């Protein structure tokens, strides 16, 4: 019994000092916000009018493995890791909707961008596909937030719905200062702006007779 006393005291001391604590660090939650640097990226519309009339943001889809809150970290050995201590404040598909909408508002080709819940009739709907939303740590000493986005403008008037315009853009921002809200906000804003600049008409094959 006497031999167990020192061990018991050692365990109590370790517990008091925190070295046996099982409590994990509290995760830090980060946002993706509308960038203050966002500006009109639209090419001049012929005749000075708008190209898309009234629109709304439709579905926002995020490819795996970027579709969950934990950051996806790209590593130098080609693998990815999931950072459970730096996470997005919500699922990325929900978090990106407002920044994308606000970017469309700043694009002169859209006459009006209504809220998702609006009952207003729209001429088009913008579908969003995110194919990259990662923290790139492949270069020693560097952390870079990356984003890649494809926008499909779907006409919603009479007749069959189809993709009328499509564009893809990428963005990156230095994240070495650890401010991931700023870094991912800038990367996403650049990617969406690039996709808007790249919008091109989608040619559809004529229906078979």
Task: Name each model feature, range by range.
Residues 1-19:
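Sec-dependent bacterial lipoprotein signal peptides
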Residues 19-93, 203-209:
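A structural "domain/chain start" motif
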Residues 20-39, 107-158:
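Surface-exposed short loop/turn segments
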Residues 57, 100, 128, 149-151, ...:
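Buried hydrophobic packing residues in well-ordered domains
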Residues 60-62, 76-78, 131-133, 150-156, ...:
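Solvent-exposed coil/turn segments that connect beta secondary-structure elements
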Residues 79-87, 157-197:
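Short secondary-structure boundary motifs at beta->alpha junctions and helix caps
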Residues 86-107:
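Structured, soluble extracytoplasmic/luminal domains of envelope-associated proteins
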Residues 101, 105-109, 135, 196-204:
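Sec-exported extracytoplasmic/periplasmic mature domains
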């Amino acid at each position: 019994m006497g031999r167990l006393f020192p061990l018991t005291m050692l365990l109590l001391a370790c517990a008091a000092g925190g070295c046996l604590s099982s409590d994990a660090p509290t995760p830090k939650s980060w946002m993706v916000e509308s960038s203050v640097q966002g500006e009109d990226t639209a090419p001049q519309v012929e005749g000075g009018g708008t190209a898309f009339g009234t629109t709304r943001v439709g579905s926002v889809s995020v490819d795996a493995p970027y579709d969950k809150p934990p950051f996806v970290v790209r590593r130098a050995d080609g693998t990815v890791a999931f950072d459970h201590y730096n996470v997005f404040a919500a699922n990325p598909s929900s978090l990106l909707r407002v920044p994308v909408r606000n970017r469309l508002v700043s694009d002169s080709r859209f006459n009006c961008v209504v809220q998702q819940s609006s009952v207003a009739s729209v001429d088009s709907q913008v579908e969003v596909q995110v194919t990259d939303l990662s923290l790139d740590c492949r270069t020693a000493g560097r952390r870079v937030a990356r984003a890649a986005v494809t926008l499909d403008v779907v006409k919603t008037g009479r007749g069959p719905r189809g993709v009328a315009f499509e564009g893809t853009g990428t963005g990156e921002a230095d994240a070495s200062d650890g401010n991931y809200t700023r870094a991912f906000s800038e990367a996403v804003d650049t990617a969406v702006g690039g996709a808007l600049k790249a919008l091109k008409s989608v040619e559809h094959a004529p229906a078979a007779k």
